[in-house]
Amino acid sequence: METIKLLNNEEFKVKDILSKMDDDSFYYGYLGKNALSSSMCKSLLESPEAYANKLKEPPKAKEPQPFRDGRLIHLLALEPHRIDELTIIDSTKGSNLYKLAVQEKPAQSVYTRSELNRCQEIADAVLENINYQELVKGAKFEIPAIANYNGLPFRGKADILLAGVVCDIKTTSDISTFKQAALLYNYDLQAALYLELFDSFEFKYVVVDKRSKEVGFFEFNDEFIESGYAKLDLATENYYKYLENKDFYDLNI
């Protein structure tokens, strides 16, 4: 596939759009609106109406702390060279220093020293794990991909990419419940999508418990992956239903 058409009908050469996807503002901003992703499928799984509502939601004034922590842990574990891009405040979020910093820079790039230290401990638990060190030998990190599935453009980034294998880092507050939570949070859909995007045959999760710092490695059976494909098919089916009724949703939602 040399070119890809986005949801807004704009067409790109795949090699050109891949080079842009390292830019977070392009990946989460422009492509967040014009390509589907595993996270956007959550509302599509519910209904076309839920997706239409999601599109019209205003940005959250305050990002949930687990999201902030997860992003910082990923950065520390996978792209530590990018830490210099962050603004670290030696004070609390309630301080004038912090409030001024988030007025001048995106909130997702401003962290307190205590947030950094806490997340560094969690990232270090992963980086210092012998099994993790063996797993990532020869791996590439934070690799973007974009491709069509059922005629629709999907985007994704592999945390860890090996030959034929995609690995994703997840954080949890209770690692003992991860397998049950995986279906609840639609990780099966993510796994199926990423196998498609990266033309791979195996998907693994590296999971770190934010409290105990325990690191676990999870693989799921074919039934889990098949469940993910079924969800992907439902999500794309509901997107086409959304398109059929887009004018109605635009006027009434």
Regions found by a protein language model. Name each.
Residues 1-155, 253:
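Metal-dependent nuclease catalytic cores that hydrolyze phosphodiester bonds in DNA/RNA
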Residues 2, 116, 180-183, 193-253:
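Metal-dependent nuclease catalytic regions and adjoining charged, substrate-binding loops involved
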Residues 59-62, 107-111, 176-185, 221-223:
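Short histidine-centered catalytic/ligand-binding loop motif
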Residues 72, 189-196:
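Short amphipathic alpha-helical face segments that pack within enzyme cores
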Residues 132-137, 163-166, 196-202:
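Secondary-structure boundary elements
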Residues 143-145, 170-171, 207:
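Short, structured patches in soluble enzyme cores that scaffold and shape functional sites
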Residues 152, 185-189:
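Short, glycine/acidic-rich beta->alpha junctions
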Residues 156-178, 194:
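Conserved catalytic cores of phosphodiester-cleaving nucleases, focusing on short active-site segments
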